[in-house]
């Protein structure tokens, strides 16, 4: 079932799953990340740590997107207001270029 909260996430090419978090709680999940409380906790901690790396003093979050790249997949993290959107996306293999 698609809700307004997740409809954009479900259209991302090569996505393997997603999480929508608010204050560490899972609001929505799907695919490989469905009901993954451990991933939600780790990502919440990662976002909190990244927010501590402010170069300029201010109340704004110091980043818009955060990518954690693994061998076969990438976790794409976007913070919007009080929500954290996480998408697990399959990395595409690059074809060799013939010269």
Curated annotation (Swiss-Prot):
Keywords for this protein: Acetylation, Lysosome, Phosphoprotein
Disulfide bonds: none
Post-translational modification: Phosphorylation at Ser-67 by PKA inhibits Ragulator complex assembly.
Modification sites for Phosphoserine: 67
Localization: Lysosome
Post-translational modification N-acetylmethionine, affected residues: 1
GO terms, biological process: cellular response to amino acid stimulus; positive regulation of TOR signaling; positive regulation of TORC1 signaling; protein localization to lysosome; regulation of cell size; TORC1 signaling
Protein name from the UniProt record: Ragulator complex protein LAMTOR4
Gene this chain is encoded by: Lamtor4
């Amino acid at each position: 079932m698609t809700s307004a909260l997740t409809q954009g996430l479900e259209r991302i090419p090569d996505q393997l799953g997603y999480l929508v978090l608010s204050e560490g709680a899972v609001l929505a999940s799907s695919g490989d990340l469905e009901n993954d409380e451990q991933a939600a906790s780790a990502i919440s901690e990662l976002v909190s740590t990244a927010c501590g790396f402010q170069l300029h003093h201010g109340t704004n979050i110091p980043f818009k997107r955060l990518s954690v790249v693994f061998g076969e997949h990438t976790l794409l993290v976007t913070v919007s207001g009080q929500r954290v959107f996480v998408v697990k996306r399959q990395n595409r293999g690059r074809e060799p270029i013939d010269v």
